[in-house]
Amino acid sequence: MDDKFTTLPCELEDYPGSITCPHCSAQITTAVDHVVGKMSWVVCTAITLACLPCCCIPFLCNSTKDVRHTCPKCKQAVFVYKIL
């Protein structure tokens, strides 16, 4: 596994950021994609205990998902901001 994820600035959170892509060396603004992560499952479990029909809500809300930053030029993942 490439260790390039750890060398990126920590300013990348849930919004696009300007960086130099560690894969293609282009100066880019990252593309963001919200993906299901641990926080989505934790909130789903908590909601299931209270109201079973509402358990899918965390999978529809971006605020509970991890954020994957990708390079729009080479399409490689450059950073994943994990909520939990």
UniProtKB/Swiss-Prot annotation:
UniProt-annotated stretches for the region Membrane-binding amphipathic helix: 39-61
Domain LITAF: 1-83
GO molecular function (one): zinc ion binding
Protein topology in the membrane: Peripheral membrane protein
SMART domains for this protein: LITAF (SM00714)
Pfam families per UniProt: zf-LITAF-like
Residues where Zn(2+) binds: C21, C24, C71, C74
Any single Gene Ontology cellular-component annotation: membrane
UniProt keyword annotations, A-Z: Host membrane, Membrane, Metal-binding, Zinc
Location of the protein in the cell: Host membrane
Name used for this protein in its record: Uncharacterized protein 075L
Originating species: Frog virus 3 (isolate Goorha)
